[in-house]
Every structure is written in structure tokens, then in C-alpha cells.
From Swiss-Prot:
Annotated function: Catalyzes the attachment of glutamate to tRNA(Glu) in a two-step reaction: glutamate is first activated by ATP to form Glu-AMP and then transferred to the acceptor end of tRNA(Glu).
Motif 'HIGH' region mapped to chain: 9-19
UniProt keyword Zinc present: yes
Quaternary structure and interacting proteins, as annotated: Monomer.
Name by which UniProt lists this protein: Glutamate--tRNA ligase
Xref: CDD domains: GluRS_core (cd00808)
Protein encoded by which gene: gltX
Taxonomy of the source species: Bacteria, Pseudomonadati, Elusimicrobiota, Elusimicrobia, Elusimicrobiales
Length: 488
């Protein structure tokens, strides 16, 4: 079988993190089996679809490196044998209308002239009788004359699919196993609007068939659409693709992931300083695991190890703490040159002037606490003291400089440092330890005041490497300043 899968988002807002996971699982499935990953833009919602949202889809997929083999591109061009890949363009090309006409001619669809008010009254009547809100088929058997009379009133019809009501619809779900819906629980869904635009359920059936999709892998929220779509495949005499429905993503409280749980727009994660590779690794584990319960994957490894059989049925819980841990692991493994490139936009965003710092020095400064960064966005705040005047942590001065020996320590170590040349880590450490020993101090009585004086922090990077990177002039200046307010 030729493996063909698709990611088919609607451009009605930002690209949701759940959408990215759906794209990822389709991408991995295609790569695992040498198949084709297709992007199709389902922009048949004339009121809500926007070009800005389409660009946001490109932004999200490009940042996460989920690059498609077929589909539209940012520049308006398309690649693939089944263009166009925007459903609005397919409407203009008349692709859907002939299939609407076919169903009408065969009695498998009908025109419905009911107004929104009439439909609401039907829903209320069904609710009063404790029946499901299923369209009762009022317009199913209208004569040509009755249709003409309604159109003379100015009514424009929708087209409804004539849903079979006998038996059941069954399929072997790739993730959930056997699934069955009673046909009596389905309804005559609208497949074409008065504008001539097809609805989601109809357009995706036509496109998935014409584009030769072998597997449809999508969220669990689509599972109720599947029996209706299968009935449409049967109406045309087509073989449906295989379906697999991914588990929902929930927040830590067990409810559907939403903004109250944190960011849901994939680009927000980019802005917050997450590495795309880390986010992709994390999303792969939201509802899937391999037999080794592996957590971290090397480049290209997910493509080799992904197996749809490893996808779970129960909802996946989005754990921000685990994502932070995973991102820190990826940051730790990133070569310092690349990490510096990634960090620079965040540094500039905080208006930290690095223009007078050469590249090698900047890399050394960023590297000094590389093992501690959880996100790129944390880097500016942790290195700011290298470039700007010290801003003391709350309580840092009182904690360190209120001690009786602090002023003598600072003045004494300043004299020691003035005589060190070159101002290097090893020499600084040796001289500091010698000063402590010679003057009867514990090393902590020296290290802590010096650290706070030069960085404003009570904890931080390796002390003597930090002093070397700050440079002799800056260190001496800051120590002298600190001595002025010692013994406060």
C-alpha cells in the first residue's frame, strides 16, 4: 500500500499545540513507512478563515520542522499531483459541485429550505420529547413545484446528505480497535451551504479520496464525524481510508487543554524560549511511547521508532514541568555557538547591549550556566550583570553584608585581586583560598560576599570563571562599591 497521510487544519486562528501533535504523528507515520505527508488547508469557513491564520500554520510547521511533501507554500506556490491544496481554490475549480450533483441525481442528497428559526423550533421540540436533535427530514420529499415555491420566497437551500438509518457503521480504528455507531443515531448533515461552499465533512471526504489518502490520523474530537464520512464513501462506492483517532490533550486538572493551563499557540512556545526540537520530542510523548519508554530522542530517531501501535487511548496530560525539564536537556546538549545564536534575539529583546562584547566572550558568558537554563528566555536575566550595573536580589545585601567581617573581607580581597595579572580563573581561586587561610576565614566567608558584590546574586555560576569573564576592572570597581555599604 502507498502510504499517504495529511494534516488538514482550518485557518481560523493560531496553530494549536494539539494541531501540531496531530501534524507530528502524521509526519512520523509517513516517514516511518516511506510515505507522503500532505498539507491541505481547509478554508471553507468563509467568515472565519483568514490569510493571517494560514501564515500562522506555515510559521508553526516550519518552526517545528514538520515539513510537508505536498501542499501549498508561503509564496503561493504548490507542490504535488493533486492541486489545488486550498479548499477555497478547489471550490473555485468546481471540484466539489459535480459530486453534490451526483448525490442529488441519485437521491442520496436533497435540498433543504428550512430557516434557522424553523430548525431551532425543531430542536426545541426534539428536546421536549427527550429525543436527539436530529433533523427530521422535513424537506426530504419536496416536489419540484414545492421547491420552486420556496425559492420564489427567496429561500436559498442547503444540501443535506440522505443518511441511511438502518444498521450500523463500523470500522477498525488504528488506535481504539473496533468502533461502531448505530445508523439511527446519525443525521442528515448539511454537505453544501447556500453559498455553494461545501461543509467540512463533505469536502474532506472528497479530497481525501481524490488525493488518495491511505490513513486518516486525527484527534478524538473527530470520532463522531467518522461514521458520517464513511457513509458518504459508501454512497460514492469508494473504499474508505483507515482511521485512527488520537487521544485528547488535557491540562493538569484533567480538563481539555486551554489557555488557562498556559500557552496553547505553538508560536508562544517559540517566544517563551523553547527549542523546537524539545517541543517536538515532548509532543511525541503526549499519547505515545515506545517499548523502551524512551524519553529523549536523537535527531532522526523518532522517524525510525514511531509506531501507531504505541499510541494510547486515554487522554494525555500536558505537564509544563516535564516540558521545562526536556527543554533544559536539549539546551544543555546544544553546541554553544548555536545556543548563542538562539539566545541573541532574547538578549536584544531585553535591551541588553552586547555590541561591545566579542563573540568568543559572549559564548563564554552564555556557556557559564548552560546546564541551568530551562528556556532561552531565562538567559538574559541570568547574564545581565555581565553587561549592566548590578541589581541585587531581594535580601542579598542584608544576608551577606550585615556580617561584621564583610567590609574587611571585601577591602582585603580587593587588594589581592589588584595584584593578579593575568586575571584568570585558576590564579583567582588560588589567591582567594590563600587569603582566607592567611586571615583565618572560612572560604564561604570570602566567596559569598564576592559573589554578591559582582553579580547581585547569592547563587550563580562558577565564581572564579565568572570573575575572569567580568574582567579585572569591573570586579575591582564592584568590590569597592560593595565595601561602602558593608556592615549595614
Amino acid at each position: 500500500m502507498k502510504i499517504r497521510v495529511r494534516f488538514a487544519p482550518s485557518p481560523t486562528g493560531f496553530l494549536h499545540i494539539g494541531g501540531v501533535r496531530t501534524a507530528l504523528f502524521n509526519y512520523l507515520f509517513a516517514k516511518r513507512y516511506g510515505g507522503t505527508f500532505v498539507l491541505r488547508i481547509e478554508d471553507t469557513d468563509e467568515l472565519r478563515s483568514t490569510e493571517e491564520s494560514t501564515q500562522a500554520i506555515f510559521d508553526g510547521l516550519e518552526w517545528t520542522k514538520l515539513l510537508w511533501d505536498e501542499g501549498p507554500f508561503r509564496d503561493g506556490k504548490e507542490n504535488g499531483p493533486y492541486p489545488p491544496y486550498l479548499q477555497s481554490e478547489r471550490v473555485k475549480a468546481g471540484i466539489y459541485q459535480k459530486y453534490i450533483d451526483q448525490l442529488l441525481e441519485e437521491g442520496k442528497a436533497y435540498k433543504c429550505y428550512c430557516t434557522p428559526e424553523e430548525l431551532e423550533a425543531m430542536r426545541e421540540e426534539a428536546a421536549a420529547k427527550k429525543l436527539p436533535p436530529r433533523y427530521p427530514g422535513k424537506c426530504k420529499h419536496l416536489t419540484k413545484d414545492e421547491q420552486a415555491a420556496l425559492e420564489a420566497q427567496g429561500r436559498k437551500p442547503v444540501i443535506r446528505f440522505n443518511m441511511p438509518s438502518e444498521g450500523s457503521v463500523e470500522w477498525a480504528d488504528l488506535i481504539r480497535g473496533p468502533v461502531s455507531f448505530a445508523s439511527k443515531d446519525l443525521y442528515d448533515l448539511v454537505i453544501s451551504k447556500p453559498s455553494g461552499f461545501p461543509t467540512y465533512n463533505f469536502a474532506c471526504v472528497i479530497d481525501d479520496h481524490l488525493m488518495e489518502m491511505s490513513h486518516i490520523i486525527r484527534g478524538e474530537d473527530h470520532i463522531s464525524n467518522t461514521p458520517m464520512q464513511i457513509q458518504m464513501y459508501k454512497a460514492f462506492g469508494w473504499t474508505p481510508p483507515e482511521f485512527g483517532h488520537l487521544p485528547m490533550i488535557h491540562g493538569s486538572d484533567g480538563t481539555k487543554l486551554s489557555k488557562r493551563h498556559g500557552a496553547t499557540n505553538v508560536i508562544e512556545y517559540q517566544k517563551q524560549g523553547y527549542l523546537s526540537e524539545a517541543l517536538v520530542n515532548y509532543l511525541a510523548l503526549l499519547g505515545w511511547s515506545n517499548s523502551e519508554s524512551q524519553q529523549l530522542f536523537a535527531p532522526g530517531e523518532l522517524e525510525q521508532k514511531f509506531d501507531i501501535k504505541g499510541v494510547q487511548k486515554s487522554p494525555a496530560i500536558f505537564d509544563n514541568a516535564k516540558l521545562d525539564w526536556m527543554n533544559s536537556e536539549y539546551i544543555r546538549a546544544t553546541p554553544i555557538s548555536k545556543l548563542t545564536d538562539l539566545a541573541i534575539p532574547f538578549i536584544k529583546e531585553e535591551n541588553i547591549d552586547i555590541s561591545k562584547t566579542d563573540r568568543a566572550a559572549l559564548e563564554n558568558i552564555i556557556a557559564i550556566e548552560q546546564e541551568k537554563y530551562r528556556t532561552l528566555k531565562e538567559i538574559p536575566g541570568l547574564i545581565k550583570f555581565f553587561f549592566e550595573d548590578v541589581v541585587f536580589e531581594e535580601g542579598a545585601k542584608e544576608k551577606v553584608y550585615g556580617k561584621p567581617e564583610s567590609k574587611d573581607v571585601l577591602l582585603g580581597i580587593t587588594r589581592v585581586y589588584q595584584n593578579i595579572e593575568p586575571f584568570k580563573e585558576a590564579d583567582l581561586e588560588a589567591a582567594t583560598r590563600a587569603f582566607a587561610k592567611d586571615n583565618g576565614f572560612k572560604t564561604g566567608q570570602i566567596f559569598h560576599p564576592v559573589r554578591v558584590a559582582v553579580s547581585g546574586r547569592t547563587h550563580g555560576p562558577t565564581l572564579f570563571k565568572m570573575l575572569e569573564l567580568l574582567g579585572k576592572e569591573t570586579v575591582i570597581k564592584r568590590l569597592n562599591e560593595a565595601a561602602k555599604y558593608s556592615n549595614i
